[in-house]
């Protein structure tokens, strides 16, 4: 800055007191550097005693000779003079301050004011606490730098008095009202004002922040959902079982006890899903299709048991005895014949027989035997008991089909009373046709169980007998 032909460089603090914040006193403070140069110091102009001081940006010819406001300093080289003259163009003029502020002093003041505000303000306080009215204007210049806050508070659209690099970001968005931009009204910010929603109001998100880093304000916790709005878990069992049955082939290698336990679980999960009361009255119960699919899997498993159960154990015992006879025949062929081709074929036959016998023995080890305490059941009795267990489990399946029929009948009556019944009856008809298909499959499996009943068993419990519909 050039004043009266002399170049001066102002520091952020005075050499005499080494303080950047100089309060007003009886006499105007003067730094030692200005006294050494024989000029009047312009550092720390007192707001109380120098209100009539002319702006520094005013040319020296227009200033009063009684109140010089400049400071000069001898420059050691022409490079310093050029650098200082170029740096003077980077100074900013605040519209509310009657003099210019050097960038070094602005940065120092902003750092000190931010530290003082952080130490004095409580947690989550976003705004700067105003100082006393007698404070120096220079100390508050950082708050008024680069933009006119009065236009934001009052809602006026007066242009800024200086070229502001942040003016584009400020004037790009509409200016909010005074009730939203009052920096001391934190009621709406913390939920005190219920009329203005800070989340739905775009002006809050667009307002520029010049007081420092943005502080996240904790929002109110969302209301806890009511019990009726919670997620329903009545259909989780059906979904899990359908996912596990997609392989298909692995389930057929389960033992009989594990197979019956899984079928019972499928029936119970289907009953739980049909008894769910969390659905809406106007929504279509899509879960009934998943229940119908699971019932179809159960019928397929019962069909497999009905086709394999009557002679399962007896056939395995017969295969074991047949394998032993085949081994004896192979041994006799090996001992009597010397032909190479015959020996090779007999060795292949022996290997196949051994593999079959090993697989059958492993299957018998995996298959649990029925017993009653210390009583060892005979093979025929065990086959008969297994058959009765299948029939008891199949009775539960028929009861599930009856519940499905009642459920669809109630659904038909409920949808018939709606304003547009034709729009809902298509879904009911699809479910009803699926039910008819399942009942037809169940009847076929039931006939297989009746045909596979052990011969000579005329004393079967009538409760286990099934009559055709």
Curated annotation (Swiss-Prot):
SMART domains assigned to the protein according to its UniProt record, in alphabetical order: GAL4
InterPro entries found in the cross-reference section: OAF3 (IPR050675), Zn2-C6_fun-type_DNA-bd_sf (IPR036864), Zn2Cys6_DnaBD (IPR001138)
Keywords, alphabetical: DNA-binding, Metal-binding, Nucleus, Transcription, Transcription regulation, Virulence, Zinc
Localization in the cell: Nucleus
An annotated Gene Ontology molecular function: zinc ion binding
Compositionally biased region (Low complexity): 104-118
Full protein name: Transcription factor phomD
Gene label: phomD
């Amino acid at each position: 800055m050039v004043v009266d032909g002399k170049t001066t460089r102002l520091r952020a603090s005075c050499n005499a007191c080494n303080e950047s914040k100089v309060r007003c006193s009886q006499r105007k403070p003067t730094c030692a550097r200005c006294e050494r140069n024989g000029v009047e110091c312009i550092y720390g102009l007192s707001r109380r005693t120098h209100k009539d001081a002319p702006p520094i940006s005013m040319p020296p010819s227009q200033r009063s000779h009684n109140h010089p406001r400049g400071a000069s300093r001898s420059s050691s080289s022409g490079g310093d003079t050029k650098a200082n003259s170029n740096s003077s163009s980077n100074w900013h003029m605040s519209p509310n301050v009657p003099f210019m502020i050097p960038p070094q002093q602005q940065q120092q003041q902003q750092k000190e004011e931010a530290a003082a505000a952080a130490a004095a303000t409580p947690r989550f306080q976003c705004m700067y606490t105003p100082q006393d009215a007698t404070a120096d204007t220079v100390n508050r210049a950082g708050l008024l730098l680069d933009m006119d806050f009065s236009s934001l508070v009052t809602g006026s659209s007066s242009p800024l008095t200086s070229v502001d690099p942040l003016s584009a970001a400020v004037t790009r968005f509409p200016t909010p009202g005074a009730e939203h931009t009052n920096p001391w009204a934190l009621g709406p910010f913390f939920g005190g004002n219920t009329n203005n929603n800070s989340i739905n109001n775009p002006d809050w998100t667009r307002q520029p922040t010049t007081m420092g880093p943005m502080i996240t304000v904790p929002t109110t916790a969302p209301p806890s959902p009511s019990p009726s709005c919670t997620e329903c878990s009545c259909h989780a069992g059906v979904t899990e079982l359908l996912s596990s049955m997609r392989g298909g082939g692995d389930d057929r290698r389960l033992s009989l006890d594990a197979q019956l336990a899984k079928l019972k679980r499928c029936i119970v999960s289907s009953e739980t899903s049909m008894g769910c009361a969390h659905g809406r009255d106007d929504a279509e119960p899509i879960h009934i299709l998943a229940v119908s699919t699971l019932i179809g899997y159960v019928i397929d498993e019962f069909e497999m048991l009905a086709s394999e159960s009557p002679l399962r154990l007896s056939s395995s015992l017969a295969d074991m005895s047949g394998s032993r006879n085949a081994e004896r025949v192979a041994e006799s062929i090996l001992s009597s014949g010397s032909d190479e081709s015959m020996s090779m074929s007999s060795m292949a036959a022996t290997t196949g027989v051994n593999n079959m016998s090993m697989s059958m023995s492993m299957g018998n080890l995996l298959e649990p035997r029925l017993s009653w305490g210390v009583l060892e059941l005979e093979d025929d009795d065990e086959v008969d008991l297994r058959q009765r267990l299948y029939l008891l489990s199949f009775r539960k399946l028929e009861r599930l089909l009856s519940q499905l029929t009642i459920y669809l009948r109630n659904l038909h009556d409920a949808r018939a009373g709606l304003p547009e019944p034709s729009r809902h009856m298509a879904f009911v008809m699809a479910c009803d046709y699926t039910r008819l298909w399942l009942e037809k499959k169940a009847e076929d499996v039931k006939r297989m169980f009746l045909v596979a009943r052990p011969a000579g068993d005329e004393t079967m419990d009538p409760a286990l007998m099934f009559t055709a519909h």
